[in-house]
């Protein structure tokens, strides 16, 4: 699972 804070918080 990868989480990114930009451009908005999302995990996929």
Curated annotation (Swiss-Prot):
The keyword DNA-binding does not apply. GO terms for cellular component: extracellular region. Expressed by the skin glands. GO terms for biological process: defense response. Coiled coil: none annotated. Disulfide bonds join 3-11. Its main location: secreted. This is Tigerinin-1O. It comes from Hoplobatrachus occipitalis.
């Amino acid at each position: 699972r990868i989480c990114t804070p930009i451009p908005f918080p999302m995990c996929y």
